[in-house]
């Protein structure tokens, strides 16, 4: 039996594929490479000495999905594929709903046809909405999302909840991520977005290496200690390990369950800049810009439930996040191309 990883060539997906291969799982990857490179999978295979089956295709292509499910005996799906930029989603809402919601519906329908009933969903802390008290806990009401991206994740969680209620054989876990950062400790894998990065740390790293001129910090007038946004950052390898823990826990649950995966503390944008400067030994040029639509002032996780039920907790802190990011970026100044 194989694990199907959608979006498996992407940042979080490729690190999770590496962890799956390292422990001996058979892995099938489906990715349209819209924000990823085949090279990331080549590097996973080189680091592990193992191979994964790769399909280049889109979730909206039913024939592609059917060929995947007919060619392989899939036991579970880890679903990363989707668009993920909060700001872009406010400008392109239909594109986000089409990819993130409709794409997931097509995937679930093809899973049903193939008799696959185990599903891990890459959700987001943005489902908690603008007015949720911090730290976020799983019992916090979800909704009140501030971007089409967050709403698309919220909608998929509701679809999963309803489908699990209607189909007793279906078991699904939604993992609500906070902000993934860092890279594999080898320096051979990391975040390499196509075009200008949407996330903070790869942008900082590309400024430090000279690929970008300066960092734009969106807002310094938030009600935080230094005025910049505060986020819960989680090392990507801790996040990958969380997916394996969730996968192993599926058999113990009934229906639908959600877990926060975060560090349980927040850092401001300026704190992240200073920590990266410490790790790299250089300076990161930045300028303050207006706030972005949909961004929140501050949030972080309460990941107690994942600790208790999944036996998962972070083991890497901000120093490891910055060290591994700089190691990756300095070894690969042009990314993994």
Swiss-Prot record:
Its cofactor is NAD(+). GO terms for biological process: galactose metabolic process. Pathway: Carbohydrate metabolism; galactose metabolism. It is an enzyme of class 5 (isomerase). Pfam families: Epimerase. Substrate binds at residues 124, 149, 179, 199-200, 216-218, 231, 292-295. The active site is at 149 (proton acceptor). GO terms for molecular function: UDP-glucose 4-epimerase activity. Its EC number is 5.1.3.2. Keywords: Carbohydrate metabolism, Galactose metabolism, Isomerase, NAD. CDD domains: UDP_G4E_1_SDR_e (cd05247). One of its GO terms (cellular component) is cytosol. It comes from the Bacteria. NAD(+) binds at residues 11-12, 31-36, 58-59, 80-84, 99, 124, 149, 153, 178. It catalyses: UDP-alpha-D-glucose = UDP-alpha-D-galactose. Gene3D superfamilies: NAD(P)-binding Rossmann-like Domain (3.40.50.720), UDP-galactose 4-epimerase, domain 1 (3.90.25.10). NCBIfam families: galE, PRK10675.1. Homodimer. Involved in the metabolism of galactose. Catalyzes the conversion of UDP-galactose (UDP-Gal) to UDP-glucose (UDP-Glc) through a mechanism involving the transient reduction of NAD. Belongs to the NAD(P)-dependent epimerase/dehydratase family. This is UDP-glucose 4-epimerase. It comes from Erwinia amylovora.
């Amino acid at each position: 039996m194989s694990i199907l990883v959608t979006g498996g060539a992407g940042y979080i997906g490729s690190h999770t594929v590496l962890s799956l291969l390292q422990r001996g799982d058979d892995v099938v990857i489906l990715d349209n490479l819209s924000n990823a490179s085949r090279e990331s999978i080549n590097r996973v295979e080189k680091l592990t000495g193992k191979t994964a089956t790769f399909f280049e295709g889109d979730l909206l292509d039913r024939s592609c999905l059917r060929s995947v499910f007919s060619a392989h005996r899939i036991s579970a799906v880890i679903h990363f594929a989707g668009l993920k930029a909060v700001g872009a989603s406010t400008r392109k809402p239909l594109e986000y709903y089409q990819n993130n919601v409709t794409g997931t519906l097509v995937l679930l329908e093809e899973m049903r046809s193939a008799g696959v009933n185990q599903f891990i969903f890459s959700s987001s802390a943005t489902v908690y909405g603008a007015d949720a008290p911090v730290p976020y806990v799983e019992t916090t009401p979800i909704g009140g999302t501030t971007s089409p991206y967050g709403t698309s994740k919220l909608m998929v969680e509701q679809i999963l909840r309803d489908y699990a209620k209607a189909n007793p054989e279906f078991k699904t876990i939604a993992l609500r991520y906070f902000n993934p950062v860092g890279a594999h400790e080898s320096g051979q894998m990391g975040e390499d977005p196509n075009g200008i990065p949407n996330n903070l740390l790869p942008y900082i790293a590309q400024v430090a290496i000279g690929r970008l001129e300066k960092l734009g910090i969106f807002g310094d007038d938030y009600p935080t200690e230094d005025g910049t946004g505060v986020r819960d950052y989680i090392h990507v390898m801790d996040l990958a390990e969380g997916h394996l823990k969730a996968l192993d826990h599926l058999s113990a649950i009934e229906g639908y369950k959600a877990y926060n995966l975060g560090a349980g503390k927040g850092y401001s944008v300026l704190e992240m800049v200073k920590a990266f400067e410490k790790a790299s030994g250089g300076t990161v040029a930045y300028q303050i810009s207006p706030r972005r639509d949909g961004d929140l002032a501050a949030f972080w996780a309460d990941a107690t439930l994942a600790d208790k039920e999944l036996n998962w907790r972070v083991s890497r802190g901000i120093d490891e996040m910055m060290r591994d990011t700089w190691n990756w970026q300095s070894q690969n100044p042009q990314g993994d191309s």
